[in-house]
């Protein structure tokens, strides 16, 4: 029993150290985005059509690199740069510490890491920078398969879902704070409101009025 307890305590401490040393923590406020959790890390996800300029900040993405968009974000962890030459040209380049792989900027340490049902992250608990797999919720690294995300396993949600009528949910392989069952997000107030029969009737009434106005016109 003592050996089992010691092993559990060791794993708990290692996981705590990893989350503590990470740039994104449970207390991070994502600018124009929201916090998510996978098996081994936390990260910010951007709202629609925005991209990450750093671990905590999302901004609007430019669609083309030219003289008017130099230093503007053109993708996650990338920006437009000017290339001197004849003629002068412009390109989308990854931020320092990242490399372009299949048109996506990934950490230098992750170029040769394949995770499967997850993604490669920087192992912040290791003094030597290495890439490790953080898995989709429901999967964990498999020591018998080069630590790829090929093993079923559970990960406890550590997100602080503090808004009223909000809870932690597993959605598409990640944990995120979402409205409880029976509630829906009100985009104007950014709060979870009850999705009652009253709401449905209001929507139906709006649809009927719109249809009547359309046919009258």
UniProtKB/Swiss-Prot annotation:
Disulfide bridges in this chain: 65-80, 74-92, 94-105, 110-120, 115-133, 135-149, 157-168, 161-177, 179-192
Keywords from the UniProt entry: Cell membrane, Disulfide bond, EGF-like domain, Glycoprotein, GPI-anchor, Lipoprotein, Malaria, Membrane, Repeat, Signal
Propeptide: 197-217
Subcellular location as annotated: Cell membrane
Keyword Cell membrane: yes
Signal peptide: 1-16
Lipid-anchored residues (GPI-anchor amidated serine): 196
Topological relation to the membrane, as annotated: Lipid-anchor; GPI-anchor
Residues that carry a glycan: 112, 165, 187, 202
Xref: Gene3D superfamilies: Plasmodium vivax P25 domain (2.90.20.10)
Annotated EGF-like domain residues: 30-59, 61-106, 106-150, 153-193
InterPro entries per the UniProt record, alphabetical: EGF-like_dom, Pvs25/Psv28_EGF
Recorded GO CC terms: cell surface; plasma membrane; side of membrane
Listed SMART domains: EGF (SM00181)
Pfam families the UniProt entry points to: Plasmod_Pvs28
Name used for this protein in its record: 25 kDa ookinete surface antigen
Originating organism: Plasmodium reichenowi
């Amino acid at each position: 029993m003592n050996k089992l307890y010691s092993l559990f305590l060791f794993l708990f401490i290692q996981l705590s150290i990893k989350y503590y040393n990470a740039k994104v923590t449970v207390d991070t406020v994502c600018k124009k985005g929201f916090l998510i959790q996978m098996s081994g890390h936390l990260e910010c996800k951007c709202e629609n059509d925005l991209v990450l300029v750093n671990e905590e900040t999302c901004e609007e993405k430019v669609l083309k690199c030219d003289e008017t968009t130099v230093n503007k974000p053109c993708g996650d962890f990338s920006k437009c740069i000017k290339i001197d030459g004849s003629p002068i040209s412009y390109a989308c380049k990854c931020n320092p510490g990242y490399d372009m792989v299949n048109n996506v900027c990934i950490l230098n340490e992750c170029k040769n890491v394949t995770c499967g049902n997850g993604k490669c992250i920087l192992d912040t608990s290791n003094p030597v920078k290495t890439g490790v797999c953080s898995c989709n919720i429901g999967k964990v690294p498999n020591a018998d398969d080069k630590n790829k995300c090929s093993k079923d396993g559970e990960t406890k949600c550590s997100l602080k879902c503090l808004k009223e009528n909000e809870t932690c949910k597993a959605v598409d392989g990640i944990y995120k704070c979402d409205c409880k069952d029976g509630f829906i997000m009100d985009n104007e107030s950014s709060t979870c409101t009850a999705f009652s029969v009253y709401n449905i009737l209001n929507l139906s009434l709006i649809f009927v009025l719109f249809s009547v106005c359309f046919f009258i016109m």
